[in-house]
Amino acid sequence: MSPPLVIKNGTVVNEDGMFKADVLVRNGIIVEVSPNITALPDTEVIDATDRLVIPGGIDPHTHMQMPYMGEVTKDDFLKGTEAAVAGGTTMIIDFCCPDHRNGESLIAGYNRWRSWADPKVCCDYGLSVAITMWRPETAEQMAIITSPEFGVNSFKFYMAYENTLMVRDDELFRGMQECAKLRALARVHCENGSVIKEKEIDLLAKGVTGPEGHTQSRPEEIEAEATNRACVLAAQANCPVYIVHVMTKGAASAISHHRAQGSIVFGEPIAAGLALDGSHYYNEDWLHAARYVMSPPLSRDPTTPELLMKLLAAGELHLTGTDNCTYDCRQKSLGKGNFTKIPNGINGVEDRMSVVWEKGVHSGIIDPMRYVSITSSTAAKIFNIYPRKGRIAVGSDADIVIFNPNATRTISKDTHHHNLDFNIFEGINCHGVAEVTISRGRIVWAHGKLQTVPGSGKFIPLLANSPFVFSTHEKREQKIQPRIVERLE
């Protein structure tokens, strides 16, 4: 057990306020937040003068140690969570993708992910489970896995990657119906896999083999169409829906439209989409271009990143993730001669907190309180762990970051903590640096050095029926009951 800890002289920032206060931590829990706390002799003291004391970041979208396309992502649960805490993130929600096509059940896939993660994680984590095909037993397994024993309250559905991860519309709709029954959140990757497949075939036939083919096979309208379709299906199922990695203006517009109609829709842009654009796919250096291959691809419109940040400021989009899914240069090079074989994925879990501060707060678009909301507290609310996570308050877990808003750092593969030989944010200078990261009362990162212990992180059960998501569900259900007309024979 870590010794008691007091953070002195800092400015506490929550989503709903900023104030000067000290923070006392004991046994991994915040036990006091008030001015002028006296440090007892056995208490470790951190001076946070001119620093912000913020809730640790929650990254709701990672793929650590994920097998796909015959490869495995380079960040396992140790390296991935080390990178996370080095950047000020104290919890990740990773996607478990059971191998349905080879007969693996949801429960077996869940157990496989737990066996990988539990011995390695150095910060807390939760799981979201992907459903990649519908089987007769799927609904029953969903019910089991949403029990407190398993602690899963969201399921992911892919509208892309035909013949591997993609579900048909009828499968997606059935899955959403089950999610609604279980009070679990449907999370959707929005593309049109069937159209993409045809466009890939056409582009290759025309001699387009490089990474530029990836973005050309996935026009921005495809993400927008799929986002609209996912929202329509969710509304028909009376199921709240969470759109992962919102990359384009059209997708964001579809979310806003459906929210205006009364649907419960959450939009998650990612760090890459808030800082970069799709010009990288046309770089003459093949490997440079391949490093940015992800799906949906980065927007071709250079004004999109700023617009997405403004939509976060306005509450039209709601939280930030990373889709951290790292493949190194050797793995990316497997797609030379055929862009469809380039493994899709990028880094982000270490740099999200600084990138969002730079592009959001330092640029003047959002304030520090909104920053806390979109990097931590909204995720905690959606996944039903607030205020245990996502808040500096008595009784909350001591997941805390001492954040220097005036410090700068230049992102580089030479200094990052990913198991990766490049960084898509290479050379970006960011204001806002996590100087100290505390995970449940344990200092895991301090002034440029990791102090992590593999396995010290904990699996956090994510319980179904989050009030933030489902508080109006029963009323909505009553309004959409089928109507029966009684007729005389």
UniProtKB/Swiss-Prot annotation:
In which tissues has expression of this protein been reported?
In L1-L2 larvae, expressed in body hypodermal cells, hemidesmosomes and in a neuronal cell between the pharynx and ring neuropil. In adults, expression is seen in body hypodermal cells and pharynx.
Q: Which PANTHER family match?
A: DIHYDROPYRIMIDINASE 1, HYDRANTOINASE/DIHYDROPYRIMIDINASE FAMILY MEMBER
Could you tell me the keywords of this UniProt record?
A: Hydrolase, Metal-binding, Nucleus, Zinc
The cofactor required is: Zn(2+)
Q: Which CDD domains match?
A: D-HYD (cd01314)
GO cellular component terms given for this protein? cytosol; nucleus
**Enzyme Commission code(s) on record:** 3.5.2.2
Known partners and oligomeric status:
Homotetramer.
**From the UniProt record, which GO molecular function terms apply?**
dihydropyrimidinase activity; hydrolase activity, acting on carbon-nitrogen (but not peptide) bonds, in cyclic amides; metal ion binding
Chain sites annotated for binding Zn(2+) 2: 156, 189, 245
Ranked from the top, the taxonomy reads: Eukaryota, Metazoa, Ecdysozoa, Nematoda, Chromadorea
- Name the residues that bind Zn(2+) 1: 61, 63, 156, 323
Q: Which residues of the sequence carry a binding annotation for substrate?
A: 161, 295, 344
Q: Report the co-factor binding details.
A: Binds 2 Zn(2+) ions per subunit.
* Domain of life per record: Eukaryota
- Where, subcellularly, is it found? Nucleus
Principal localization reads nucleus
Q: Which InterPro entries match?
A: Amidohydro-rel, Hydantoinase/dihydroPyrase, Metal-dep_hydrolase_composite, Metal_Hydrolase, Metallo-dep_Hydrolases_sf
* Posttranslational modification: Carboxylation allows a single lysine to coordinate two zinc ions.
**Family listed:** Belongs to the metallo-dependent hydrolases superfamily. Hydantoinase/dihydropyrimidinase family.
Q: Give residues where N6-carboxylysine occurs.
A: 156
**Protein name, per record:** Dihydropyrimidinase 1
The species this protein was found in: Caenorhabditis elegans
